[in-house]
Amino acid sequence: MNEQDPILQLLVSTRAGGGPQHVLTVALGLQRRGWRFVVAGPGDGPMVEQFRAAGVDVVPLPTDRLTPLTLLRLVRLIRARKVRLVHSHGKGAGLYGRLAARLAHVPAVHTFHGLHYERYPGPARALYLALERRLSRITRVVVNVSRAQEREGLSLELFTSGQSRVVLNGVDVARLAGSALERRDARAALGLDLAEAVVGCAARFDEVKRLDVLVRAAALSPGFALVLIGDGPEGARLRRLAAELGVARRLRVAGEVPEAARLFPAFDVFASAARKEGLPLAVVEAMALGLAVVASDIPAHREVLGAPCEGLVDGTAGAFAARLSSVLADAGLRARLGAENRTRARSELDARTMLAALEGLYGEILGL
């Protein structure tokens, strides 16, 4: 092994989303400092081309399906590319990555991008938690993307305090600002009028994101258009709900957009009604771009926005409708919240802090 041997970043998805975007930021930042990476994951997502454009070697691997052949292919990949460390992201990738690292005799790091176990019925939940506890025994370090997540994981005994490192997900503020469209262009891309009030959200269309709350809030407060950027299993249900509530004309579903934050300048307010998050990267991106944010009062949102915060609400459609209406009606309040968010993102959630922490972690594990 030498210092030019790569680190493998293993993903369970290459769709546009927080995990793949995080890995892209890490690869872009640490390659400039001399690190080499291989990214492996499903080959059908739009982020694949983003990685390749960044000069990252991408190997298609169906980590979103459980098969012994995938594990065998992963072990062969680690050996063929002389991978010196495996860093996995997400459930399926965490299973494959840690088992393959063990078989190939290289250290394993795993990042939890949220602890989403509640959706499983009782027996399946117990089985999943038991599996994570066993996998922790062959994991050198567990990275938690927020302090709230670390506390929850420790309470569930998914890892030990000695294994855990908290590395807050950060965004490349300068790159984000440079790639964002002007307000006029962003609105044109989304088919929005310059004069209308716009609330936006970018998320996977999954039940845990509770995008239905935002649709219901739009029905309760007729003064704004709602833009949802993303895709997922809840898409059809959200469209039906909008039609039932009479807000289909005010709903824009933009679909899956790589680097969706480029379009955030189209929004007057960014909203997140998620029931649970690891660390909400899209919220951090909105903050970095100086947007006011209205979000459900959950630990991850409190951690990134700061608490107390005027943008936090109790998570009901009525609470969202009321707060969104008040923020949209007050340009001074929007400007102040946006400025506070930008300052907080740049001081506490900039990618440079995250990259330094991960570089230190990799160096420590590899004895560099």
Which role does the model predict for each range below?
Residues I138-R165, V171-R175:
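A short, active-site helix/loop in glycosyltransferases that binds the activated sugar's phosphate group
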Residues G306-G318, S326-G332:
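Conserved acidic donor-binding segment of nucleotide-sugar-dependent glycosyltransferases
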Residues Q9-L69, Q149-G153, E157, P233:
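N-terminal strand-loop element at the rim of the active site
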Residues R239-G255:
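Nucleotide-activated donor-binding/catalytic signature segment of Leloir-type glycosyltransferases, i.e.
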Residues G17-L28, A197, C201-L220, P233-R240:
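A conserved mid-protein helix/loop that constitutes part of the nucleotide-sugar donor-binding site
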Residues A40-G41, A292-A295:
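Short hydrophobic beta-strand element within catalytic cores of glycosyltransferases
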Residues E256, R275:
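Aromatic "clamp/platform" in nucleotide-sugar-dependent glycosyltransferases that forms part
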